[in-house]
Amino acid sequence: MNERSLRILEFNKIKEKIKKYARTNAAKAKVEDLEPYDNLYEINNKLEETNEALEILISKGNPPLEGLADIHEGIERAKKGGTLSPGQLLKVGGMLKATRNMKEFFKREEVEKSYPKLEDLAYILAPVKALEDEIERAIVSEDEISDKASQTLCNIRRSLKEKNSSVREKISSIVRSNSKYLQDDLYTMRGDRYVLPVKSEYKSQVPGLVHDQSSTGATFFIEPMSLVNLNNEIRELFLKEKAEIERILSDLSLKVKINGDSCLSNLKVLVEFDFIFAKGRYASALNAIKPIVREDGAFSIFSGRHPLIENDKVVPSDIYLGEEFQTLMITGPNTGGKTVTIKTVGLLHIMGLSGLLIPARDNSSIAFFKEIFADIGDEQSIEQSLSTFSSHMTNIVNIMKHVDDKSLALFDELGAGTDPAEGAALAVSILETLRNRGAKLIATTHYSELKAYALKTDGVENASVEFDIETLRPTYRLLIGVPGKSNAFEISKRLGLVEGVIKRAKEYMSEENLQFENLIRELQEKSIIAKKEAREAKMLRDQAEDLKKKYEEKLEKLENTREKAYMDARREAKEIIANAKDEADDILKAMRELEKLGIAGGGRQRLEEERKKLKDSLEEREKGIHKMKENEGESITNVTLGMEAYLPSLNQKVIIVSMPDNRGEVQVEAGIMKVNVKLKDLRKTQVTKEEKVRRKREVKLNLSNVESRVDLRGLDAEEACYKADKYLDDAYMANLGEVTIVHGKGTGVLRKAINDMLKRHPHVKSYRLGAYGEGGDGVTMVELKG
C-alpha cells in the first residue's frame, strides 16, 4: 500500500490510539509497523485473531500479561556469562509468570467456546516453573535479595541482626556515660561502623578511631575502641552477605542462560499476544466488528463511522460500491461532509486489510484492494481547506500511472480550482479513463455537469450528503442515488437576502436547468426508496436463510440428543434385565444341582413353582422398568425458575425454565434441547454424600492454598487495589495472621494507593512497611484480625 494514501487517510493516528492499549515497547513497535497485508489468507487470519481477542475480552476479561517486560538485554548478558542484576532477574521472572498464566488462561473445558487462533498461539508457550519459582523466592525488589534465597544468606542476616543489636546496646551505654563530651546524645554511622559525635575539645577523652570530621571542625566522629571488634565482625558479615548474594545472582544467571532460548521464544509469543489484545481493546473501544473481505472488488459498509471522530459527533453512513455501479459521484455544497465520507471509506478499508476490526454494523464487507489511492486536499486533516488545482493535478497524474482493476481511487472535489467548464470536462475524462481500467472510484464534486454525467452513464451512481435547510447545517448522512444541490437560493433566503434579489437570480437561470434539477431530485428520491427497500428485502431474506439453516442444525442436534438419551435408557434397562436373568440362571442351575442330589418330588414341584414365579417377575420387571424410574425420588410441589430436577424418562438432570401451565406442564432444558413435561413426572434431585464431602473438600483446599504474600508489581493502582482486596478476603478466610503485600518501591504511587485501601479494609488490624530483610519499602506487612 502506498505511503501517501496511508498518510492522507490518517492511518498513523489509528496506530497511535492502538499503541495506548499495548503494554510492551515491542508490541508498540509492531503496531507502528502495521499496514495492509498483501494476501487474502493473511488478512482473514489476522481479522480472526483480533476478533477472538475481542470476544475473550468481553467473556473472560483482560489476559494475565502483568509483569511482562523486555528481557533481551538480560538474556544476552546471561548468554555471555555475565551476572544479571536483581532488576533483570525480576523481568525474567515476570515474563515466566506471564507465560504460565497465559498458558492457564487458554485452558478450557470442552463445553466452553474455543478460540482456535489464539489457542494455537498459546500452545507454543513453554513455562519454566522451576526457574520462575527460584527467582520469585530469591528476588524481593530491584535492590534487595530475600532471606529465603539461601539458608546461608538467612544465617548471615540473622547474625547481622544479633551483632547490630549488641552494638546498639553497647554504644547506647557509652553515649549515656559520655554524654557531656558529645554534640548530641545519639550515635551515628560512618560507612558500616557505629561512631559517636564527639566535641573537638574532648576528642582525647573518648579513646577510639577517628573516622570523620564535620565541615566546621567542631565535631569528630569517633569509633570507641570497645566497639572496634564488634564493628569488625559486622563488617565481615556484610562482606559475607555480599559474596553470598553474588553467588545467588550468578547461580540464577546461569539458569537463565540455560533456559535463554526458551525464554526468548516465550517472550516473542507474549509480545504477539500483547499486540493482538491491543487491537482487540481498540476494537472494543470503537464497538467494532469483523468485516467480510470480498475478492470481487465490491463492498457494503453498513452504518460505517469515521474512527477519528468522537462517538457523540460522528454520523453513521451506509456506503456500498461494486455490484450495481463501479463509480460513486458524491455531490453537494462544501462543508457538507463529503470529504469525511470518502475518508471513512478509505480508512475503514485500510483498517480491515491490516487485520483491524472496523466501526460498522454486522455483515458489513470490504473489498480486497491491492492499492488505495487518495487525492484529498493538500494532505490536510478533515477540517482544513482544499489545495490548489496544480497540487491536485500533480497527485492525480501520479495516481493514473498506477491504477488498475485491483485499485480503489478516492478524489475530493475532482476538477476544482479552475474554470468550472474545463474542470468538469477534465473530471469526466479522468473518471472514464480509470473506469475503463476496471478501478473502483468515489469522487466528490459540486459541479452540475458531473451530476448529469452520473445520471446518464451506466455504472456511475449519484450520491449526496443531506443538508438541513431549516438549520443551514449538513446532517452528514449519505444518500446514495440522490444528487446533491447547492441550495444557494434556500440558504441565501434563510440568511436574510431579500426575496426580489433571489427571484431575479432565478430568472438568470434557464427554465430547463431549474426543471432539470427538480426532475432529477424527484426521480432519484423515488429510486433511492426502491433500492433501499430492495436491499433491505435481500438482507432480510439472507437473514431468514441463515436462521433457517441454524434452526435446522439445532433441530438435527435435538433429534440426535433425544435419540441418544432414549438409546442410553434402553441400554441401561437391558443391562439391568440381563444381570437379573444371569442371576436367575445361577439360581436355577443351583436348584438343578440340588435336584440331582436327591430332592423329593414335592420339592421339585416347589422348584418349578419358584422358577415360574421368577420368570414372571423378570417379565414384569422388564415391562415396568420405566415405571420404576419414574416412581423414584421425591415429587416436586414448589417450582422456582432455574431449579434443577431429575427427569426419569430421560434418566438425566434438567433445568426448569417455565412455571406450570393450566395443564400442569413445565418446560425444561436438557442439554441443548427444551421439552414440555408433566410436573408430576419430575423428581427432586438428590445431592449424594460423596458430592457433599467433595464440595466441602474443595472449599478447604481453596482456603489452604492461599499464600502468605501477594505480588502487585506491574499493575496500575486500580487493578492492584482490586487484587489486594480480594486477596485479603481470602487470607482472612484462611485464618492467616500476617501477610505480605509486594508493591515495589518505584514512585510510591502504588504504595500510597494500597495504604489508603488498607486504612478502610474491615479485615486489617494493622500494617507497616517491611523491615530490612522483609523487603523494606517495597513491601507492606499486614496483620489481619483474628
Swiss-Prot record:
Q: Where is the Smr domain?
A: 710-785
Q: Where does ATP bind?
A: 332-339
Superkingdom of origin organism: Bacteria
Record keywords, A-Z: ATP-binding, DNA-binding, Endonuclease, Hydrolase, Nuclease, Nucleotide-binding, RNA-binding, rRNA-binding
Q: Does the keyword Hydrolase apply?
A: yes
An example of a GO molecular function for this protein is: ribosomal large subunit binding
Q: Choose any GO biological process term that the UniProt entry carries and state it.
A: rescue of stalled ribosome
Q: Known EC number(s)?
A: 3.1.-.-, 3.6.4.-
Does the record bear rRNA-binding in its keywords? Answer: yes
- One protein family per Pfam: Smr
Briefly, what is this protein's role?
Answer: Endonuclease that is involved in the suppression of homologous recombination and thus may have a key role in the control of bacterial genetic diversity.
Oligomer and partners: Homodimer. Binds to stalled ribosomes, contacting rRNA.
- Family, as annotated: Belongs to the DNA mismatch repair MutS family. MutS2 subfamily.
Name it: Endonuclease MutS2
